[in-house]
Amino acid sequence: MRKMKERQSKKAKGFFALDRNNMLLKLKEIQHAVSFSKKFLYNWVKIKANHPSEVDPIFALYLVTKRCNFRCVYCYAESNERISKIAPDDLDFDQNVELLKVIRKDVANLYFSGGEPLLRKDIVDILKACRDLNYHILSLTTNGSLLDKKPEVADYLNYLAISLDTLDEKKNDQLSGVRAGTTKKIIAVTKEFAALQKEKNFTLLVNAVIGEHNIPDIYGLMDFCFEHNIGLSVIGQMENFRPIKYLRTSKEYFKLVEHILDCNAKGYPILGMPQFNKTMLMFEKHTCFPLLIPTIYPNGDLLYPCEVLNKKRYNLLETGSIREAYRRGQKEVGKKLDCPGECYMPAFIVASCFMQQPLSAIKQGIKVKMGNCYNQSVKEDRATIKQVV
């Protein structure tokens, strides 16, 4: 009894011994957790009542620029006519701050993508503005080619993702449409940032797109990520938001997928709960809730209900909030979303799996957040990856 009281006393002292800044951070974490839990419960009730058009967004994907210095052969942003026709005009910094204020009214978690976000000269200032606006979780995806020039982005991020499809430098240069030597630089930068995760308190991820061109290479990429404490996120190559025909019939692909799912189940740092990766990589039909994670375009546009169905377009600087854009969408389009659940946008499948398996999603979130300390048995088991091929 006495020892128990001593332990409780130490825990209490530990919290109150925090300096003012750390204590405020802890309180913000608690506040965010409570707010997120309330929103999840509200959305769960709406979905169970078959009113998916009435949910509140939990995350937003912001394509901060359409400009890109890569020309990836599989990029859906280039191949999809519907996306290419969207106004590509980037907002200036002041307009971005106003847009971020609008987004923050409805969500505390923001994911930056593009295009290539680091092509914006003011990207660091934009991330600083997000912190000033009290965003909770900030993520950014980059091709990595400009990270050495803007390393300070990591100071403001919770998650930094680098796109890399193979360690074969010549092949990756060709797939990315860049000059020779670019991938060599990206791999070196990836290693450098992997070593900074603990110091700067962020999680590094590698995003890989699996296609006919690189299936055998993914095994080596997995080993590279696990060796350097990097989370790995993989998806199949898409065309018009659907998997390419080759992957649907490739035995080599499904053999790789089985291995990825096995590693996921064993606790390797593979991003995504098992159900997400199974749905995403096996192309299983799913129930989609696109309004949970809206996509916002460089000029502030939001497509209702999503970029696939694309029935209405609203500019958030004009509507003043995401909820108002949703309200107008419900009024003009109707509350029925008419989604067949056959596209494979990762954000939509994440939302679907989260709402259907919340405990598993929370467990996965904790695992990713603690991705720098996956267990020793997993480290020792890495050699088995090389034996699969």
Predicted regions mapped to residue ranges:
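Radical SAM enzyme core and accessory elements
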Residues: M1-E54, N299, K311-Y314, E324, ...
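Conserved alpha-helical substructure of the radical SAM core
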Residues: K10-K11, F15-K150, N158, G365, ...
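Generic structural signal for small/hydrophobic residues in well-ordered secondary structure
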Residues: V64, C68, D92, C130, ...
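Radical SAM/AdoMet-radical enzyme domain recognition
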Residues: F93-S113, R120-G236
